[in-house]
Amino acid sequence: MVVLPEGHPLAGQGQFPHKALLDYPFILLEKGEQSEIRTFFQDYDLPLRPCFVTLDDYAIMSMVESGLGISILPQLILQRCPYRIVQKELDVPAYREICFAFRSLDSLSLAARRFLDCLGSLRL
C-alpha cells in the first residue's frame, strides 16, 4: 500500500499511479538484503531515489504524517495504524509472500492460530 500524508494531491483519487512514486520524495523501508520495494521498482523499471531510508515501519508512518514524503508499506502493518495518513492501493500489483509452516493445526498455540486466522482474512 502507498502511504501519503493527509491533504496530498493524490489522496482523494482511486488507485495510486505507480509512476507517480517518482514525483514525490520517497521514504524507503529497508529490511535485510532482499528488499521487496527495491524489487518492485526494478520490476516496473522505475529508478529508486529515496530521500530517507529506515528500518522501522512506524518511523515511516510518522515521517509521512509529518509531510516528509510518501512510502510503500505492507498492508498488515497498516491494519492498526495510529497515524493520520492515507492508504492507497497501487494501480499495478505489489505483494510479498508470507510463509507459515507448522506440523499440524492441533499443535498450534492460540497465538499461532490467531495469526493464521489473520493471514486468512487478508485480501490476497
Where are these regions (language model features)?
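Residues embedded in well-ordered beta-strands
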Residues: 1-3, 9, 27, 70, ...
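Extended ligand-binding regions for polar small-molecule ligands
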Residues: 101-124
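Flexible hinge/capping segments at coil-to-helix
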Residues: 4-26
